[in-house]
Each structure stands twice: as C-alpha cells, then as structure tokens.
Amino acid sequence: MNTVIMILVVMTIIGLIFGLVLAYVNKRFAMEVNPLVDLVEDVLPKGQCGGCGFAGCKAYAEAVVLDESVPPNLCVPGKAAVAEQVAKLTGKSAPPIEPRVAHVRCGGDCTKAVKNFEYEGIHDCVAANLLEGGPKACKYGCLGFGTCVKSCPFGAMAMGSNGLPIIDTDICTGCGTCVSACPKQVLGFRPVGSKVMVNCNSKNKGGAVRKACSVGCLGCGLCAKNCPNDAIKVENNLAVVDQSICASCSEATCLAKCPTGAIKAIVSGTDLQQQSKNEAAANS
C-alpha cells in the first residue's frame, strides 16, 4: 500500500514539474500574434479552397497582414466585397477583380462520346485516368466519375444524368478546386459575362475527333472565319473564344456555323436540377 502511495506521490511531483516547465517554455518562447490576422480571417469565407495560393484561410490571413507584397484581393470566393474589407483592414489597395466561374470544356456525354472499353474500377476520375487514359476514345474529354463534384467546397456542382458535371454559376466562386481536381484539365475558367464557349478540350485533328465524339471541335475554322468581331481563333486544332472581344452578336454566327455544335451559348441558373435539363437540351 505504501509503495502505491509513494508511486502516486512521485508521479504527481513529476507531473507538476513538467507542467511548470511547459508553462515556462510557453511564456518564454511565446510568439506574439498580430490581432489583425484574426480580424482578416474573420472576413474570409472559410472555404479552405486554396484558391488564393496559400494553405487555407488562416495562412492567407497571416500572409496578407505580415507580408507587404501579398495583395488583399487573392480570395477568389470572397470576390470584390471581401477584397475591399481585407484592403481596409490591412491598409492596402485592392485592384478590381474580374468575376469568374468554372466551366466544363467538354460536350462528350455518355450518348455522344465513343468508348474504347467498359471501366469497372474505382469510381474516380484520377483512378480511371491511370488505365489507358480512361474508357473514352477521346483522351481529352471528361471521364464522368465526378471527382470534381466531390472536390467542390461550396456545393456548386452536381453530376448530370448525361454523365457530365453541371456547375451552378450562382453558387460557383471560381476558387479553382475543381479545376485542380480534374486529371484531364477539362475544367477551366470563364468570365461571368461570357456568352458563348467552346465545349471541347481536344487538341486532336478533325478526323480523329470525329471518330471519338460527335460534338467535338474539328478545328475547321468556320467559326473564326465567320465571326464578325474576329473574336475566335483556332489554336492547336481547337477553337478559342477571346471573351474580351466576343460581343455575342445577335446572329450568333459561330453557333450557326459550327458543324458539330461544339460552340454553345452559356447556360446559367440557380437550380442544379433545372440546369441539368437545360444542359441536356443545349447538348441535344
């Protein structure tokens, strides 16, 4: 019994000694925390998306407060409102931000894209891509397993019934998480005011594209030749729309001239279910 009591006393003394040592170390080597960091972090949306280039909101708050070279407008989800608040707190100037949203640069859904084989592995785009680039004949197209949807920290994406992801542009913050998650680089950004986009990501020549997908861009250049604003160019066998020039002419010349319908008018909406119907109709 005495031995047990002695052990308890010794352990208690050791615990007290360690506690005192830790308290001293904590006080002696404590780093001063700038209260402004917490104030800046409080105005950030807490999406932890990393779109700012830092490892989360706390890291960005520390950087923008402590480093003069870090601008106050890097929080993409926060947009102009958050940029203005951060600028006010830090005494920095916030240049204007062009609002952007993510866009799926592929129209090759399960009814239009040719498959080379049936994939029965892990339901994940990264995993499927490891097997010969995925089951689709087009190695630039969306694999349709929803890795981007799962990665979205704001719930702005859903998988459509046609096997392509749908983006709710009223929820999308343009943070870029889905863009980074896609192994095919199918997802990209577009300005919020965009009117038309090329729903194709293939760099293959027209003949190969036609064999792999019925709605792929052939790189024929008809859209570029007929655009009254000279806003379209063909680069690497793919039509590219310069959104700073495109005025979405009332005739919608590029849409009418595209032989495969790869160029589409932008579809936006707040309800993902309704947008799914709109996307299906637009791709039909």
From Swiss-Prot:
<dbReference type="Pfam" id="PF12838">
    <property type="entry name" value="Fer4_7"/>
</dbReference>
<dbReference type="GO" id="GO:0022900">
    <property type="term" value="P:electron transport chain"/>
</dbReference>
<protein>
    <recommendedName>
        <fullName>Proton-translocating ferredoxin:NAD(+) oxidoreductase complex subunit B</fullName>
        <ecNumber>7.1.1.-</ecNumber>
    </recommendedName>
</protein>
<comment type="subunit">
    <text>The complex is composed of six subunits: RnfA, RnfB, RnfC, RnfD, RnfE and RnfG.</text>
</comment>
<dbReference type="InterPro" id="IPR007202">
    <property type="entry name" value="4Fe-4S_dom"/>
</dbReference>
<feature type="binding site">
    <location>
        <position position="75"/>
    </location>
    <ligand>
        <name>[4Fe-4S] cluster 1</name>
    </ligand>
</feature>
<keyword id="KW-0677">Repeat</keyword>
<feature type="binding site">
    <location>
        <position position="182"/>
    </location>
    <ligand>
        <name>[4Fe-4S] cluster 2</name>
    </ligand>
</feature>
<feature type="binding site">
    <location>
        <position position="175"/>
    </location>
    <ligand>
        <name>[4Fe-4S] cluster 3</name>
    </ligand>
</feature>
<dbReference type="InterPro" id="IPR017900">
    <property type="entry name" value="4Fe4S_Fe_S_CS"/>
</dbReference>
<dbReference type="GO" id="GO:0046872">
    <property type="term" value="F:metal ion binding"/>
</dbReference>
<keyword id="KW-1003">Cell membrane</keyword>
<feature type="region of interest" description="Hydrophobic">
    <location>
        <begin position="1"/>
        <end position="26"/>
    </location>
</feature>
<feature type="binding site">
    <location>
        <position position="138"/>
    </location>
    <ligand>
        <name>[4Fe-4S] cluster 2</name>
    </ligand>
</feature>
<feature type="domain" description="4Fe-4S">
    <location>
        <begin position="32"/>
        <end position="92"/>
    </location>
</feature>
<feature type="binding site">
    <location>
        <position position="220"/>
    </location>
    <ligand>
        <name>[4Fe-4S] cluster 4</name>
    </ligand>
</feature>
<keyword id="KW-0813">Transport</keyword>
<dbReference type="GO" id="GO:0005886">
    <property type="term" value="C:plasma membrane"/>
</dbReference>
<feature type="binding site">
    <location>
        <position position="246"/>
    </location>
    <ligand>
        <name>[4Fe-4S] cluster 5</name>
    </ligand>
</feature>
<feature type="domain" description="4Fe-4S ferredoxin-type 4">
    <location>
        <begin position="239"/>
        <end position="269"/>
    </location>
</feature>
<feature type="binding site">
    <location>
        <position position="148"/>
    </location>
    <ligand>
        <name>[4Fe-4S] cluster 2</name>
    </ligand>
</feature>
<dbReference type="GO" id="GO:0051539">
    <property type="term" value="F:4 iron, 4 sulfur cluster binding"/>
</dbReference>
<feature type="binding site">
    <location>
        <position position="258"/>
    </location>
    <ligand>
        <name>[4Fe-4S] cluster 5</name>
    </ligand>
</feature>
<keyword id="KW-0408">Iron</keyword>
<feature type="domain" description="4Fe-4S ferredoxin-type 1">
    <location>
        <begin position="133"/>
        <end position="162"/>
    </location>
</feature>
<dbReference type="Pfam" id="PF04060">
    <property type="entry name" value="FeS"/>
</dbReference>
<comment type="function">
    <text>Part of a membrane-bound complex that couples electron transfer with translocation of ions across the membrane. Couples electron transfer from reduced ferredoxin to NAD(+) with translocation of H(+) out of the cell. Essential for energy conservation during autotrophic growth. Contributes to ATP synthesis during heterotrophic growth.</text>
</comment>
<keyword id="KW-0472">Membrane</keyword>
<keyword id="KW-0520">NAD</keyword>
<feature type="binding site">
    <location>
        <position position="52"/>
    </location>
    <ligand>
        <name>[4Fe-4S] cluster 1</name>
    </ligand>
</feature>
<feature type="binding site">
    <location>
        <position position="172"/>
    </location>
    <ligand>
        <name>[4Fe-4S] cluster 3</name>
    </ligand>
</feature>
<keyword id="KW-1278">Translocase</keyword>
<keyword id="KW-0004">4Fe-4S</keyword>
<feature type="binding site">
    <location>
        <position position="217"/>
    </location>
    <ligand>
        <name>[4Fe-4S] cluster 4</name>
    </ligand>
</feature>
<feature type="domain" description="4Fe-4S ferredoxin-type 3">
    <location>
        <begin position="206"/>
        <end position="237"/>
    </location>
</feature>
<feature type="binding site">
    <location>
        <position position="178"/>
    </location>
    <ligand>
        <name>[4Fe-4S] cluster 3</name>
    </ligand>
</feature>
<feature type="binding site">
    <location>
        <position position="142"/>
    </location>
    <ligand>
        <name>[4Fe-4S] cluster 2</name>
    </ligand>
</feature>
<keyword id="KW-0479">Metal-binding</keyword>
<dbReference type="GO" id="GO:0009055">
    <property type="term" value="F:electron transfer activity"/>
</dbReference>
<comment type="similarity">
    <text>Belongs to the 4Fe4S bacterial-type ferredoxin family. RnfB subfamily.</text>
</comment>
<dbReference type="InterPro" id="IPR050395">
    <property type="entry name" value="4Fe4S_Ferredoxin_RnfB"/>
</dbReference>
<feature type="binding site">
    <location>
        <position position="57"/>
    </location>
    <ligand>
        <name>[4Fe-4S] cluster 1</name>
    </ligand>
</feature>
